Curated annotation (Swiss-Prot):
Enzyme Commission no: 2.1.1.189
UniProt-recorded name of the protein: 23S rRNA (uracil(747)-C(5))-methyltransferase RlmC
Keyword Translocase tagged: no
Binding-site list for S-adenosyl-L-methionine: Q225, F254, E275, N322
GO process terms (BP): rRNA base methylation
Residues of the active site: C349
Organismal lineage: Bacteria, Pseudomonadati, Pseudomonadota, Gammaproteobacteria, Alteromonadales
Role noted for this protein: Catalyzes the formation of 5-methyl-uridine at position 747 (m5U747) in 23S rRNA.
Gene name tied to this protein: rlmC
Organism expressing this protein natively: Shewanella baltica (strain OS185)
Amino acid sequence: MSAAIVNAVKQCGYFNQGQCLSCRHIQQPLAQQVAVKTQTLQQLLAPFIPANSAELFLPPITGDDSGFRNKAKMVVLGAAHEPVLGIVSPSGEAVDLCDCLLYPGDMQALLHRLTRFVQQAGLPPYRVDKAKGELKFILLTRSQVRGEYLLRFVLRSHNGIERIERELPALLAEYPQIKVVSVNIQPIHMAILEGDEEIFLTENTRLEERFNHVPLFIRPKSFFQTNPQVAAQLYQTARDWVAEFSPRSLWDLFCGVGGFGLHCASNDITLTGIEIEAEAIACAQMSAQMMGLENVQFMALDSTDFAKGKSAADKPDLIIVNPPRRGIGEALCQSLSEFAPKAILYSSCNPKTLAKDLEHIQGYHLTKVQLFDLFPHTDHFEVLAMLVKD
Protein backbone atom coordinates (compact mmCIF):
# COMPACT_ATOMS: atom_id res chain seq x y z
CA MET A 1 0.00 0.00 0.00
CA SER A 2 1.60 3.25 -1.08
CA ALA A 3 1.99 6.28 1.18
CA ALA A 4 0.18 8.33 -1.47
CA ILE A 5 -2.94 6.19 -1.17
CA VAL A 6 -2.87 6.29 2.63
CA ASN A 7 -2.44 10.07 2.68
CA ALA A 8 -5.16 10.55 0.06
CA VAL A 9 -7.69 8.65 2.13
CA LYS A 10 -6.74 10.47 5.32
CA GLN A 11 -7.29 13.78 3.54
CA CYS A 12 -10.86 12.96 2.50
CA GLY A 13 -12.51 16.32 1.93
CA TYR A 14 -16.00 14.95 2.50
CA PHE A 15 -15.06 13.82 6.00
CA ASN A 16 -12.96 16.86 6.86
CA GLN A 17 -15.83 19.18 5.94
CA GLY A 18 -18.40 17.13 7.84
CA GLN A 19 -20.30 16.29 4.65
CA CYS A 20 -20.01 12.49 4.95
CA LEU A 21 -19.15 10.70 8.18
CA SER A 22 -19.60 7.10 6.98
CA CYS A 23 -15.85 6.39 7.27
CA ARG A 24 -15.74 7.40 10.91
CA HIS A 25 -12.19 6.11 11.49
CA ILE A 26 -10.62 7.35 8.26
CA GLN A 27 -8.21 9.64 10.14
CA GLN A 28 -6.68 6.67 11.96
CA PRO A 29 -3.88 4.59 10.39
CA LEU A 30 -5.24 1.36 8.97
CA ALA A 31 -3.02 -0.71 11.28
CA GLN A 32 -4.53 1.06 14.28
CA GLN A 33 -8.06 0.46 12.99
CA VAL A 34 -7.38 -3.26 12.59
CA ALA A 35 -5.77 -3.47 16.03
CA VAL A 36 -8.92 -2.02 17.62
CA LYS A 37 -11.13 -4.42 15.65
CA THR A 38 -8.94 -7.35 16.69
CA GLN A 39 -9.22 -6.36 20.34
CA THR A 40 -13.00 -6.06 20.02
CA LEU A 41 -13.23 -9.52 18.47
CA GLN A 42 -11.00 -11.12 21.11
CA GLN A 43 -13.05 -9.59 23.92
CA LEU A 44 -16.34 -10.81 22.43
CA LEU A 45 -15.06 -14.36 21.91
CA ALA A 46 -13.06 -14.60 25.15
CA PRO A 47 -15.72 -16.77 26.87
CA PHE A 48 -15.29 -19.40 24.15
CA ILE A 49 -11.48 -19.47 24.04
CA PRO A 50 -9.66 -21.85 26.42
CA ALA A 51 -6.91 -20.41 28.59
CA ASN A 52 -3.53 -20.05 26.90
CA SER A 53 -5.12 -20.50 23.46
CA ALA A 54 -4.48 -17.06 21.98
CA GLU A 55 -2.96 -18.83 18.96
CA LEU A 56 -6.50 -19.62 17.80
CA PHE A 57 -6.63 -16.04 16.52
CA LEU A 58 -4.82 -16.00 13.20
CA PRO A 59 -3.32 -12.75 11.83
CA PRO A 60 -5.99 -10.41 10.39
CA ILE A 61 -6.37 -10.10 6.62
CA THR A 62 -6.43 -6.59 5.17
CA GLY A 63 -6.47 -5.00 1.72
CA ASP A 64 -6.24 -1.56 0.19
CA ASP A 65 -7.84 1.28 2.12
CA SER A 66 -9.03 3.16 -0.98
CA GLY A 67 -10.34 2.22 -4.42
CA PHE A 68 -11.57 -1.13 -3.12
CA ARG A 69 -15.35 -0.77 -3.12
CA ASN A 70 -17.30 -2.34 -6.01
CA LYS A 71 -20.75 -0.94 -5.26
CA ALA A 72 -22.17 2.57 -5.12
CA LYS A 73 -25.60 3.39 -3.70
CA MET A 74 -26.31 6.96 -4.74
CA VAL A 75 -29.30 8.96 -3.59
CA VAL A 76 -30.40 11.22 -6.46
CA LEU A 77 -30.86 14.76 -5.19
CA GLY A 78 -31.09 18.28 -6.58
CA ALA A 79 -33.21 18.98 -9.66
CA ALA A 80 -33.54 17.50 -13.15
CA HIS A 81 -31.42 20.29 -14.66
CA GLU A 82 -28.81 20.05 -11.88
CA PRO A 83 -28.85 16.57 -10.31
CA VAL A 84 -26.60 15.47 -7.47
CA LEU A 85 -25.56 11.84 -6.91
CA GLY A 86 -24.57 11.16 -3.34
CA ILE A 87 -26.07 11.59 0.11
CA VAL A 88 -27.79 14.09 2.34
CA SER A 89 -25.20 15.52 4.75
CA PRO A 90 -25.78 15.64 8.53
CA SER A 91 -26.70 19.31 8.05
CA GLY A 92 -29.29 18.44 5.39
CA GLU A 93 -27.33 19.48 2.28
CA ALA A 94 -27.07 17.48 -0.95
CA VAL A 95 -23.51 16.16 -1.25
CA ASP A 96 -22.02 14.91 -4.53
CA LEU A 97 -20.11 11.70 -3.67
CA CYS A 98 -18.93 10.79 -7.16
CA ASP A 99 -15.31 11.35 -6.10
CA CYS A 100 -15.52 9.18 -2.97
CA LEU A 101 -12.07 7.62 -2.64
CA LEU A 102 -13.49 4.22 -1.78
CA TYR A 103 -14.40 3.82 -5.47
CA PRO A 104 -11.88 2.92 -8.22
CA GLY A 105 -11.04 5.76 -10.60
CA ASP A 106 -13.03 4.34 -13.51
CA MET A 107 -16.07 4.03 -11.27
CA GLN A 108 -15.74 7.66 -10.18
CA ALA A 109 -15.62 8.73 -13.83
CA LEU A 110 -18.74 6.70 -14.66
CA LEU A 111 -20.63 8.19 -11.73
CA HIS A 112 -19.89 11.67 -13.07
CA ARG A 113 -21.14 10.54 -16.49
CA LEU A 114 -24.32 9.22 -14.89
CA THR A 115 -24.91 12.62 -13.34
CA ARG A 116 -24.91 14.07 -16.85
CA PHE A 117 -27.13 11.20 -18.01
CA VAL A 118 -29.79 12.14 -15.46
CA GLN A 119 -29.57 15.76 -16.60
CA GLN A 120 -29.81 14.86 -20.29
CA ALA A 121 -32.75 12.54 -19.65
CA GLY A 122 -34.52 15.23 -17.66
CA LEU A 123 -35.28 12.80 -14.85
CA PRO A 124 -36.63 14.71 -11.83
CA PRO A 125 -35.05 13.47 -8.58
CA TYR A 126 -37.54 12.22 -6.03
CA ARG A 127 -38.24 14.78 -3.30
CA VAL A 128 -38.93 13.05 -0.01
CA ASP A 129 -40.25 16.23 1.59
CA LYS A 130 -42.82 16.74 -1.19
CA ALA A 131 -43.35 13.09 -2.24
CA LYS A 132 -42.79 14.20 -5.84
CA GLY A 133 -40.31 13.32 -8.57
CA GLU A 134 -39.24 10.05 -10.19
CA LEU A 135 -35.61 9.00 -9.74
CA LYS A 136 -34.80 7.84 -6.22
CA PHE A 137 -31.47 6.01 -6.45
CA ILE A 138 -28.74 5.01 -8.86
CA LEU A 139 -27.07 1.72 -7.92
CA LEU A 140 -23.82 0.80 -9.64
CA THR A 141 -21.91 -2.48 -9.23
CA ARG A 142 -18.47 -3.14 -10.72
CA SER A 143 -16.89 -6.50 -11.59
CA GLN A 144 -13.14 -6.64 -11.06
CA VAL A 145 -12.63 -9.21 -13.82
CA ARG A 146 -13.01 -6.89 -16.80
CA GLY A 147 -14.17 -3.69 -15.15
CA GLU A 148 -17.75 -4.34 -16.27
CA TYR A 149 -20.84 -2.82 -14.67
CA LEU A 150 -24.40 -3.48 -13.58
CA LEU A 151 -26.44 -0.26 -13.51
CA ARG A 152 -29.82 0.14 -11.81
CA PHE A 153 -32.20 3.09 -11.77
CA VAL A 154 -34.69 3.06 -8.89
CA LEU A 155 -37.84 4.94 -9.94
CA ARG A 156 -41.08 5.86 -8.19
CA SER A 157 -43.13 4.75 -11.20
CA HIS A 158 -42.86 3.68 -14.83
CA ASN A 159 -43.02 7.29 -16.00
CA GLY A 160 -39.27 7.78 -16.29
CA ILE A 161 -38.45 4.61 -18.22
CA GLU A 162 -38.98 6.15 -21.66
CA ARG A 163 -36.53 8.95 -20.88
CA ILE A 164 -33.92 6.44 -19.72
CA GLU A 165 -34.38 4.35 -22.87
CA ARG A 166 -34.01 7.48 -25.02
CA GLU A 167 -30.58 8.35 -23.61
CA LEU A 168 -29.32 4.81 -22.99
CA PRO A 169 -27.87 4.03 -26.47
CA ALA A 170 -25.46 6.97 -26.26
CA LEU A 171 -24.36 5.95 -22.77
CA LEU A 172 -23.75 2.33 -23.78
CA ALA A 173 -21.83 3.43 -26.88
CA GLU A 174 -19.56 5.52 -24.67
CA TYR A 175 -19.34 2.88 -21.93
CA PRO A 176 -19.61 -0.58 -23.54
CA GLN A 177 -18.42 -2.05 -20.25
CA ILE A 178 -21.92 -1.42 -18.85
CA LYS A 179 -23.29 -4.91 -19.44
CA VAL A 180 -26.53 -4.90 -17.43
CA VAL A 181 -29.03 -2.06 -17.07
CA SER A 182 -32.32 -2.33 -15.21
CA VAL A 183 -35.05 -0.19 -13.72
CA ASN A 184 -36.46 -1.01 -10.31
CA ILE A 185 -39.89 0.34 -9.40
CA GLN A 186 -40.19 1.45 -5.78
CA PRO A 187 -43.51 3.35 -5.40
CA ILE A 188 -43.64 3.51 -1.61
CA HIS A 189 -42.95 6.81 0.14
CA MET A 190 -40.53 5.26 2.62
CA ALA A 191 -36.78 4.87 3.03
CA ILE A 192 -36.74 1.57 1.13
CA LEU A 193 -33.94 0.99 -1.36
CA GLU A 194 -35.80 -1.14 -3.89
CA GLY A 195 -39.20 -2.53 -4.82
CA ASP A 196 -40.38 -5.90 -6.12
CA GLU A 197 -40.52 -5.07 -9.84
CA GLU A 198 -37.29 -5.20 -11.89
CA ILE A 199 -37.33 -4.30 -15.60
CA PHE A 200 -34.24 -5.12 -17.66
CA LEU A 201 -33.25 -2.71 -20.42
CA THR A 202 -30.41 -4.91 -21.70
CA GLU A 203 -30.32 -8.46 -23.00
CA ASN A 204 -27.81 -9.39 -20.30
CA THR A 205 -29.35 -9.85 -16.87
CA ARG A 206 -26.30 -10.81 -14.82
CA LEU A 207 -22.76 -9.57 -14.25
CA GLU A 208 -19.90 -12.06 -14.05
CA GLU A 209 -17.32 -11.87 -11.28
CA ARG A 210 -14.50 -14.32 -10.58
CA PHE A 211 -12.72 -15.09 -7.31
CA ASN A 212 -9.86 -17.60 -7.21
CA HIS A 213 -10.93 -18.98 -10.63
CA VAL A 214 -14.48 -19.57 -9.34
CA PRO A 215 -17.12 -17.85 -11.53
CA LEU A 216 -19.77 -15.99 -9.56
CA PHE A 217 -22.69 -13.98 -10.89
CA ILE A 218 -24.37 -10.80 -9.71
CA ARG A 219 -28.00 -10.01 -10.43
CA PRO A 220 -29.79 -6.84 -9.33
CA LYS A 221 -31.20 -8.18 -6.06
CA SER A 222 -28.55 -10.70 -5.07
CA PHE A 223 -26.20 -9.87 -2.19
CA PHE A 224 -22.52 -9.65 -3.07
CA GLN A 225 -19.45 -8.69 -1.03
CA THR A 226 -18.42 -5.06 -1.61
CA ASN A 227 -14.65 -5.56 -1.16
CA PRO A 228 -13.56 -8.12 -3.77
CA GLN A 229 -9.87 -7.99 -2.85
CA VAL A 230 -10.44 -9.16 0.72
CA ALA A 231 -13.47 -11.28 -0.17
CA ALA A 232 -11.28 -13.41 -2.45
CA GLN A 233 -8.99 -14.11 0.50
CA LEU A 234 -12.00 -14.89 2.70
CA TYR A 235 -13.28 -17.49 0.23
CA GLN A 236 -9.81 -18.99 -0.29
CA THR A 237 -9.31 -19.33 3.46
CA ALA A 238 -12.68 -21.04 3.80
CA ARG A 239 -11.70 -23.44 1.02
CA ASP A 240 -8.42 -24.28 2.79
CA TRP A 241 -10.04 -24.81 6.19
CA VAL A 242 -12.81 -27.02 4.81
CA ALA A 243 -10.32 -29.12 2.83
CA GLU A 244 -8.64 -30.17 6.08
CA PHE A 245 -11.74 -32.24 6.91
CA SER A 246 -12.04 -33.92 3.48
CA PRO A 247 -15.85 -33.76 3.61
CA ARG A 248 -17.92 -35.92 1.26
CA SER A 249 -21.06 -33.87 1.91
CA LEU A 250 -21.51 -30.19 2.63
CA TRP A 251 -24.29 -27.73 3.41
CA ASP A 252 -23.89 -24.04 2.63
CA LEU A 253 -26.62 -22.20 4.57
CA PHE A 254 -27.41 -18.54 3.80
CA CYS A 255 -25.32 -19.28 0.71
CA GLY A 256 -26.11 -16.14 -1.30
CA VAL A 257 -24.67 -16.57 -4.80
CA GLY A 258 -22.75 -19.62 -3.59
CA GLY A 259 -19.35 -18.10 -2.91
CA PHE A 260 -18.36 -20.34 0.00
CA GLY A 261 -19.88 -23.61 -1.18
CA LEU A 262 -18.62 -23.29 -4.75
CA HIS A 263 -15.09 -22.63 -3.51
CA CYS A 264 -15.25 -25.90 -1.58
CA ALA A 265 -17.10 -27.92 -4.21
CA SER A 266 -15.89 -30.74 -6.42
CA ASN A 267 -17.51 -33.74 -8.07
CA ASP A 268 -16.36 -35.79 -5.08
CA ILE A 269 -18.47 -33.67 -2.72
CA THR A 270 -22.25 -33.46 -2.48
CA LEU A 271 -23.08 -29.78 -1.96
CA THR A 272 -26.44 -28.36 -0.90
CA GLY A 273 -26.80 -24.58 -0.88
CA ILE A 274 -29.75 -22.83 0.78
CA GLU A 275 -30.68 -19.15 0.38
CA ILE A 276 -33.99 -17.30 0.73
CA GLU A 277 -33.36 -14.94 -2.21
CA ALA A 278 -34.33 -16.64 -5.48
CA GLU A 279 -32.15 -14.36 -7.63
CA ALA A 280 -29.06 -15.36 -5.66
CA ILE A 281 -29.92 -19.04 -6.08
CA ALA A 282 -30.25 -18.52 -9.84
CA CYS A 283 -26.73 -17.05 -9.83
CA ALA A 284 -25.35 -19.98 -7.83
CA GLN A 285 -26.93 -22.46 -10.24
CA MET A 286 -25.32 -20.68 -13.20
CA SER A 287 -21.92 -20.92 -11.52
CA ALA A 288 -22.31 -24.62 -10.75
CA GLN A 289 -23.28 -25.30 -14.35
CA MET A 290 -20.31 -23.33 -15.68
CA MET A 291 -17.97 -25.25 -13.36
CA GLY A 292 -19.37 -28.59 -14.53
CA LEU A 293 -20.39 -29.63 -11.02
CA GLU A 294 -22.82 -32.54 -10.87
CA ASN A 295 -23.46 -33.26 -7.18
CA VAL A 296 -24.74 -29.77 -6.40
CA GLN A 297 -28.19 -28.55 -5.44
CA PHE A 298 -29.09 -24.92 -4.71
CA MET A 299 -32.57 -24.17 -3.36
CA ALA A 300 -34.43 -20.94 -2.56
CA LEU A 301 -35.55 -21.71 0.99
CA ASP A 302 -35.25 -20.30 4.49
CA SER A 303 -32.15 -21.86 6.05
CA THR A 304 -33.73 -22.38 9.46
CA ASP A 305 -36.83 -24.02 7.96
CA PHE A 306 -34.64 -26.23 5.76
CA ALA A 307 -32.69 -27.47 8.76
CA LYS A 308 -35.87 -28.08 10.78
CA GLY A 309 -37.14 -30.35 8.03
CA LYS A 310 -34.08 -32.57 8.13
CA SER A 311 -33.27 -35.48 10.43
CA ALA A 312 -29.91 -36.35 11.94
CA ALA A 313 -29.62 -39.10 9.32
CA ASP A 314 -29.50 -36.41 6.62
CA LYS A 315 -26.61 -34.55 8.21
CA PRO A 316 -23.60 -33.63 6.06
CA ASP A 317 -19.98 -33.96 7.12
CA LEU A 318 -19.58 -30.19 7.39
CA ILE A 319 -21.91 -27.18 7.49
CA ILE A 320 -21.07 -23.64 6.40
CA VAL A 321 -23.19 -20.75 7.69
CA ASN A 322 -22.90 -17.18 6.43
CA PRO A 323 -25.88 -15.35 7.97
CA PRO A 324 -26.85 -11.67 7.79
CA ARG A 325 -26.05 -9.39 10.71
CA ARG A 326 -28.78 -10.88 12.91
CA GLY A 327 -26.89 -14.20 13.09
CA ILE A 328 -28.34 -17.69 12.67
CA GLY A 329 -30.61 -17.61 15.73
CA GLU A 330 -31.28 -20.04 18.56
CA ALA A 331 -33.49 -22.41 16.53
CA LEU A 332 -30.83 -23.07 13.90
CA CYS A 333 -28.14 -23.32 16.58
CA GLN A 334 -30.19 -26.11 18.15
CA SER A 335 -30.57 -27.88 14.80
CA LEU A 336 -26.82 -27.71 14.14
CA SER A 337 -26.10 -29.09 17.60
CA GLU A 338 -28.49 -32.00 16.99
CA PHE A 339 -27.04 -32.77 13.54
CA ALA A 340 -23.55 -32.82 15.06
CA PRO A 341 -21.49 -32.66 11.84
CA LYS A 342 -17.72 -32.98 12.05
CA ALA A 343 -17.31 -29.23 11.85
CA ILE A 344 -19.16 -25.95 11.36
CA LEU A 345 -17.59 -23.06 9.47
CA TYR A 346 -19.22 -19.80 10.57
CA SER A 347 -18.65 -16.63 8.54
CA SER A 348 -20.00 -13.61 10.40
CA CYS A 349 -20.33 -9.92 9.58
CA ASN A 350 -21.40 -9.18 13.16
CA PRO A 351 -19.19 -10.61 15.94
CA LYS A 352 -21.80 -9.72 18.57
CA THR A 353 -24.37 -12.10 17.10
CA LEU A 354 -21.61 -14.64 16.43
CA ALA A 355 -20.84 -14.67 20.15
CA LYS A 356 -24.54 -14.96 20.96
CA ASP A 357 -24.92 -17.92 18.59
CA LEU A 358 -21.86 -19.65 20.03
CA GLU A 359 -23.64 -19.73 23.39
CA HIS A 360 -26.35 -21.91 21.81
CA ILE A 361 -24.24 -24.26 19.66
CA GLN A 362 -23.59 -27.23 21.93
CA GLY A 363 -20.84 -29.82 21.68
CA TYR A 364 -18.32 -27.76 19.69
CA HIS A 365 -15.15 -25.80 20.35
CA LEU A 366 -13.36 -23.13 18.36
CA THR A 367 -10.12 -24.14 16.66
CA LYS A 368 -9.47 -21.13 14.40
CA VAL A 369 -10.65 -17.54 14.22
CA GLN A 370 -9.58 -14.96 11.65
CA LEU A 371 -10.60 -11.35 11.05
CA PHE A 372 -11.08 -10.05 7.50
CA ASP A 373 -11.18 -6.26 7.18
CA LEU A 374 -13.72 -5.94 4.37
CA PHE A 375 -14.89 -2.54 5.62
CA PRO A 376 -11.93 -0.21 6.28
CA HIS A 377 -12.55 3.02 8.23
CA THR A 378 -15.68 1.62 9.89
CA ASP A 379 -16.39 -0.50 12.97
CA HIS A 380 -17.48 -3.42 10.78
CA PHE A 381 -15.49 -6.50 9.76
CA GLU A 382 -15.95 -10.13 8.76
CA VAL A 383 -14.95 -13.08 10.93
CA LEU A 384 -14.27 -16.67 9.93
CA ALA A 385 -14.58 -19.16 12.80
CA MET A 386 -14.06 -22.92 12.67
CA LEU A 387 -15.98 -25.02 15.17
CA VAL A 388 -15.03 -28.67 15.59
CA LYS A 389 -17.09 -31.34 17.34
CA ASP A 390 -15.87 -32.15 20.86
